[in-house]
Amino acid sequence: MKPVPSTNGKVDDKVEHHNLSSSSSSSSSSSSSDTKFNISNRYGNFLQRLEALDIWPESNEQILLEPYTYLTNIPGKEIRSMMIDAFNHWLQVPRPALEIIKKIVGQLHTASLLMDDVEDDSDLRRGVPVTHKIYGIPQTINTANYVYFLAYQELTKLKPCLRSDATTDLWSLVNDELLQLHRGQGMDLYWRDSLTCPTEEEYLQMVNNKTGGLFRIAIKLMIALSPIPETPDYLPLVNLVGIIFQIRDDLLNLSSVYTKNKGFCEDLTEGKFSFPIVHSIRSDSTNHQLMNILRQKPTDIGTKAFAVSYMKDRTKSLEYTRGVLICLEEQAIEEVTRLGGNPALESIFELMHVLPSPPATDQN
């Protein structure tokens, strides 16, 4: 049917509109049918497809763990693994179970490092850029949390290794120590962010919670899996080792030894109250220079070198820290002797006894 011309020679608007509407309606109806067919075809049997969606591809696992493997591929101190082997001189845990414990502690340790670096806004870890500078903060945090749960999965592999008379709840054991670890980390962050200098006693409690936690997880798991029915109380020694390790780490951070791996005096840049810094501030409460330097979180070498010189020469805090380390090391060696001796553990103490080089004051 041809459009009817109007009296002015144009096509009647109503007729044209009717034709367009008919065409549009037909097209819309066809499109709607296609859409319904596609939805029905794709989702009509969705319940049967749900099971396949539960399958987690290995390629996805690799993507999720990439921030974690980035850090694990960079060699660390391995002090915790060495400690586990040393304590096994006494506890005699079968090798397969011991390797699982090492894996669990390694996972928890690396996950905590990922989180620490984010919370401290660090730049370097083991001499390379920290993970979140490569993968971003959201992905790094998610991976760290994921690895915590992977460690709990590994715990289930230890249950068959428990002695028949053992009543230890492995999950509660690990959970209690992770609570302690986060309590310690929480106080460390609070002091830093509120610029509150703790007492030495408060600092030591924080370290015992934070650094000692992973050491205790390892030894408590080993005690639970040891074939020896009655063992001495090794935990005081474990706690002492954790404190020695952290104080030594604090001292090293103010020396040239750490410059390559962590950056020169990184604790000052992060505004942290480490053991030498706590002693220095508490030794001379009338001088606010060091506290003000921490407030600024300096990145320049000159300011940090000045702070180190102040702690070294004015308050003698570096000498004091070395003295505390020597005193604690002697007590640890005495405790090892009391427990029957342990050549592997004594070797670790000798390694840790090597005091850092004199503090670096010129990095030019």
UniProtKB/Swiss-Prot annotation:
Its cofactor is Mg(2+). Keywords: Isoprene biosynthesis, Lyase, Magnesium, Metal-binding, Multifunctional enzyme, Transferase. It catalyses: isopentenyl diphosphate + dimethylallyl diphosphate = (2E)-geranyl diphosphate + diphosphate; isopentenyl diphosphate + (2E)-geranyl diphosphate = (2E,6E)-farnesyl diphosphate + diphosphate; isopentenyl diphosphate + (2E,6E)-farnesyl diphosphate = (2E,6E,10E)-geranylgeranyl diphosphate + diphosphate. GO terms for biological process: isoprenoid biosynthetic process. Mg(2+) 1 binds at D116, D120. Binds 2 Mg(2+) ions per subunit. Its EC number is 2.5.1.-, 2.5.1.1, 2.5.1.29, 2.5.1.10. The record marks Y148 as: Important for determining product chain length. A motif (DDXXD 2) lies at residues 116-120. CDD domains: Trans_IPPS_HT. SUPFAM superfamilies: Terpenoid synthases (SSF48576). Geranylgeranyl pyrophosphate synthase that catalyzes the trans-addition of the three molecules of IPP onto DMAPP to form geranylgeranyl pyrophosphate. Does not show any monoterpene nor sesquiterpene synthase activity. This is Geranylgeranyl pyrophosphate synthase. It comes from Melampsora larici-populina (strain 98AG31 / pathotype 3-4-7) (Poplar leaf rust fungus). The lineage of its organism: Eukaryota, Fungi, Dikarya, Basidiomycota, Pucciniomycotina.
